[in-house]
Amino acid sequence: MVKSMYAYVREAWARPDKSDVKALLWDRMQVWRREGSVTRIDRPTRIDRARALGYKAKQGIAVVRVHVRRGGRRASRYVRARRSARMGKNSSTPGKSIQRIAEERASVRYPNMEVLNSYWVGQDGKLKYYEVILVDGHHPSIQSDKNLAWLANPTHRGRAERGKTSAGRKGRGMRTRGRGTEKTRPSIRSHANQGK
């Protein structure tokens, strides 16, 4: 059976360090580092991943590249009244993933659009890069699309901020059901915050 073009793209991105993607990222990173934290782009870098997550090349859909710092939370150092061992700075981590932070920043930059999904496109020593798919639910071409018309419903407003995207649901423990996930429902804050 003949493989499609998307299959070859998917295989190349499955192991970026072992394929031609490594050389591409080397060149692209030098340009991406000089860009802003949220940059709108003409077309997705990973077309296979974007289409799998709902992207379509039509009006009302935009793709932005977002970079977020790598590592734990950058909490400021206490000024007084603690020994350094009691500051708790070595393992201070945020309660959400870096991908989720990227989605929220894209949502804030484009308040008239909703985050559909996002995917990883690269990282260097300091930053992680994600591409976020944004949809304008009020655009006529979106409202007439049977796969995307649901985003026009006001119920889905602020999806990224409420953890309703794929990355958000993963961070809230909603990917699995049943045994071992009793504390994550009805929400991650229920059961005295024992879900995380």
From Swiss-Prot:
SMART domains: Ribosomal_L15e. Residues 156-196 are annotated as: Disordered. SUPFAM superfamilies: Ribosomal proteins S24e, L23 and L15e. Pfam families: Ribosomal_L15e. It comes from the Archaea. GO terms for cellular component: cytosolic large ribosomal subunit. InterPro entries: Rbsml_eL15_core_dom_sf (IPR024794), Ribosomal_eL15 (IPR000439), Ribosomal_eL15_arc (IPR020926), Ribosomal_uL23/eL15/eS24_sf (IPR012678). Keywords: Ribonucleoprotein, Ribosomal protein. One of its GO terms (molecular function) is RNA binding. The keyword Isomerase does not apply. GO terms for biological process: cytoplasmic translation. Residues 167-178 have a biased composition (Basic residues). HAMAP family: Ribosomal_eL15 (MF_00256). Belongs to the eukaryotic ribosomal protein eL15 family. NCBIfam families: PRK04243.1. PANTHER family: LARGE RIBOSOMAL SUBUNIT PROTEIN EL15, RIBOSOMAL PROTEIN L15. This is Large ribosomal subunit protein eL15.
